[in-house]
Amino acid sequence: MKVVIKSYEESNEEIKVVFSSKFGEGIALWQGAIPKEGNSYDVELEIPNLLKWGKDIQGKKSNCFLIEILDNKVCFEGTLESISEEDGCCVVRLGDSIILLETEGVPLEVQSYLRFETDNIILYENNR
């Protein structure tokens, strides 16, 4: 996913960034060298939390892709592309990007529109 770093803050050996993408804005921990504000980066986005269907993940009727900050959490809207019945891992599509999620509970049907929220996101810069 392409993101632009709007700002960053260092504390306790962690780098927290505010980023924007063509789908909206979010907040995440940054892994790697300190990013430059205003620069564009190709990143991999990790959600390390186990998300629960019906609580952290909800079905949506709209078919838009979105990232937004709401009540100190980052909310994503996308399409459920696939899910593993064995371990609950699923792939969510946001435009031309995908996000892998670990989930538990009864999932939506593949190709459903969904919204999920988390307060734990890690961005890794992709090596070119």
Language model features by range: what are they?
Residues 54-70, 128:
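Short, compositionally biased
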Residues 14-59:
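Acidic (E/D-rich), amphipathic helical modules within compact regulatory domains
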Residues 18, 44-46, 79-81, 93, ...:
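Residue-level recognition of well-ordered beta-strand positions that form the cores
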Residues 9-10, 34, 45-51, 118-128:
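Short, charged beta-turn/beta-strand-edge "cap" motif at the junction between a beta-strand
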Residues 13-17, 86-92:
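Short aromatic-glycine-enriched beta-strand elements
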Residues 77-80, 88-89, 105-110, 126:
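Oxidizing extracytosolic/periplasmic lumen-facing domains
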Residues 1-11, 64-86, 112-116:
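Structural detector for short beta-strands of small beta-barrel domains
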Residues 20-35, 93-122:
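Beta-strand/loop nucleic-acid-binding surfaces
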